Amino acid sequence: MEGNMFAHIYQVRSDVFGTSYENEISKIRNEILTCIKNDDCPITPRFIMFKVMDRCNSGCIYCGYARQNHPDKDGCKSYILNTNELIDIFDQAAELGVDAIALNGGEPLLRNDIGVLTEALNKRRILPILMTNGVLLDSKWKELGVAGLKYIIISIDSLIPEHYEFQRGISYIAAMKGVQAALEMRKKYGDVIIHLTAVLTRYNLEDILTLVDFCNANRIWLEISVYDTYGMTEDKLSVTDRIGLKRVVTKLKELKKEGSYISSSYEYLNHLEEFCLEHNRIPQKYSCYSGYGILLLDDLLNARTCWGSQVGDIGNIKNSSLSEVWNNSKMRHYRKKMLGGRCGGCWNLCTEFNSMIRNI
């Protein structure tokens, strides 16, 4: 299996739905490049990241949900979308031809219908992906296994309890029980991709290589996420140790070449030092393709094509259909802005979509 998150998605789709991995990737790549050439847009987003729950049971020090209340338009506690509302959006996504939807939050396992949502996506031939802190997975993995979940992403920053709890604000033991639950799920239901994400900061820089060893031993993929300073009044987390960072990144690239379970692409790793040390910005003249394949929905159904600070809301699914939002003038504007490298934004997981399109 290729070491790239979006490549994994299409490889799992081929196993679950009987599609051709090579044909799907080639079709997406050709469609996007043709759309760019003809100043057009694809008929569908390929991947939707959906915040299906605004509440969270962890307190990550770098997360907006942990730093702020999230009121709705009436100034009250935010509205939690019900099952039927979500399934209606799944129907729209299926009609458009969306390939995968990641259920995240907040913490999606705080929902009582997470198994129902997973099954609903599978029935519509949309690959469900669960993005979780793992704490509640110990009590829900059997339900999710029966529902057909085949891709789990768990946030684990470190295997040192003190470092993990400092960054995540929740019990390390509980989170690791979630990882063990995912392993049990794979053992019982088979072919489940387990994928850890670690947010890189100055506090866990030296812990990352140990995480790689753990992932290799358990056939778990590891994605390195960067710490984004957007919205921060002060920055006490960014990596400043140039020598240490270079050593870790160099080793990560060596391990990936040797076949380690590192999901971050070479393109991502090649620019990781630049991002961490040069004011958290993407490389100059970087062309981002995510506007041609990715759509983000928050818990109030606001749609964006990027969480980056320079890319705003493009519409709301309550007021417009998914198709209308994907094709509206704001989306077209931001799509071109991102393609031209004028967003000045982030260096997060969407770069893996870019790597897939550029075949890097």
Predicted feature residues:
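Short, solvent-exposed loop/turn segments at secondary-structure junctions
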Residues: 55, 108, 136, 158-161, ...
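Short, solvent-exposed turn/loop segments enriched in Gly/Ser/Thr/Pro and often Arg
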Residues: 106, 265-267, 345
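Cys/His-rich metal-chelating microdomains
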Residues: 55, 59, 63-66, 291, ...
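Radical SAM/AdoMet-radical enzyme domain recognition
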Residues: 83-104, 110-226
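Flexible mid-to-C-terminal extensions adjoining Fe-S/redox cofactors in radical SAM and related proteins
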Residues: 1-44, 282-285, 289, 300-360
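Conserved alpha-helical substructure of the radical SAM core
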Residues: 2-151, 233, 240-241, 359-360
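Alpha-helix N-cap and loop-to-helix initiation/capping positions
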Residues: 77-81, 167-174, 239-244
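A C-terminal junction/extension of Radical SAM enzymes
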Residues: 24, 32-36, 41, 189-193, ...
